[in-house]
């Protein structure tokens, strides 16, 4: 949903944001009242945009697996939301945006024509996008980087990371550098931060012993051999960058890292 925030600046109209969880209260009727107030404000300030974050908090399906108990506060709130959206005509100057990571549980009535007409899937950023996001957070924090830091390389190591993950990665790298009293954040700090995000924190007090270490070493070596063979046989496939048999807080006894 962070992808929607730039809309506030680009649209140059009032941007009214809220979280759907704010509508749900102990007292029945409060949620519906807040929805009415929200839409009344948007109409008064039209042209305007309403942004409802985590809309699944009040808009779960009323049928089947995700059924809402009848007369529940959430159902009244959802009904009011549907009523307000039906009240818009084609010339309405109010646009409603909703964000959720659980589109599968939303009530079908929410997706009917005249309500939420369009669905936009926001995927995790690609390598170019990740590099741009890293640049933003490094610049925003005025982070002093070492000469060996190449954000394009860091972006290649972070496949599948969201914008929030990348922001946390920059913070983690800065913390790791700070703990060692460094005056700049070096590439190794980013690498360790990536490893922590992917595999967890090293358990330095829980090292593998004897046959267990041998089994894990063979297992990870097998991953590395296959990964290396694939990278040589198929053009464009990444090579194995690192192996580890240090236990991690994520219950992994080791890992083989291959960036995309």
From Swiss-Prot:
EC number: 3.4.24.-
Cofactor note as given: Binds 1 zinc ion per subunit.
Example of a GO cellular component annotation carried by this entry: chloroplast thylakoid membrane
Pfam families: AAA, AAA_lid_3, Peptidase_M41
Localization per Swiss-Prot or TrEMBL: Plastid, Chloroplast thylakoid membrane
Its membrane topology: Single-pass membrane protein
Cofactor(s) in the UniProt record: Zn(2+)
Name the UniProt record assigns to this protein: ATP-dependent zinc metalloprotease FTSH, chloroplastic
Native species: Helianthus annuus (Common sunflower)
Gene name of this polypeptide: FTSH
């Amino acid at each position: 949903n962070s992808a929607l925030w730039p809309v506030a600046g680009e649209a140059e109209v009032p941007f009214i944001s809220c979280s759907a969880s704010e509508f749900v209260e102990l007292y029945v009727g409060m949620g519906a009242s807040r929805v009415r107030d929200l839409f009344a404000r948007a109409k008064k300030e039209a042209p305007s945009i309403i942004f409802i974050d985590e809309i699944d908090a009040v808009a779960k399906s009323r049928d089947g697996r995700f059924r809402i108990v009848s007369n529940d506060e959430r159902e009244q709130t959802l009904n009011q939301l549907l009523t307000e959206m039906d009240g818009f005509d084609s010339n309405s100057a109010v646009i409603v945006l909703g964000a959720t990571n659980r589109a599968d549980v939303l009530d079908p009535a929410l997706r009917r024509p005249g309500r939420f007409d369009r669905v936009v899937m926001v995927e995790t950023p690609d390598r170019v996008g990740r590099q741009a996001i890293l640049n933003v957070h490094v610049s925003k924090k005025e982070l002093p980087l070492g000469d060996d830091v190449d954000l394009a390389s860091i972006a290649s190591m972070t496949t599948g990371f969201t914008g929030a993950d990348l922001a946390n990665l920059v913070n983690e790298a800065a913390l790791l550098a700070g703990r060692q009293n460094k005056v700049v954040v070096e590439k190794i700090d980013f690498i360790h931060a990536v490893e922590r995000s992917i595999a967890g924190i090293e358990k330095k007090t829980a090292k593998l012993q004897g046959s267990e270490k041998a089994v894990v070493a063979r297992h990870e070596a097998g991953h590395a051999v296959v990964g290396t063979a694939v990278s040589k046989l198929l053009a464009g496939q990444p090579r194995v960058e690192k192996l580890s048999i240090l236990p991690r807080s994520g219950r992994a006894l080791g890992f083989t890292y291959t960036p995309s």
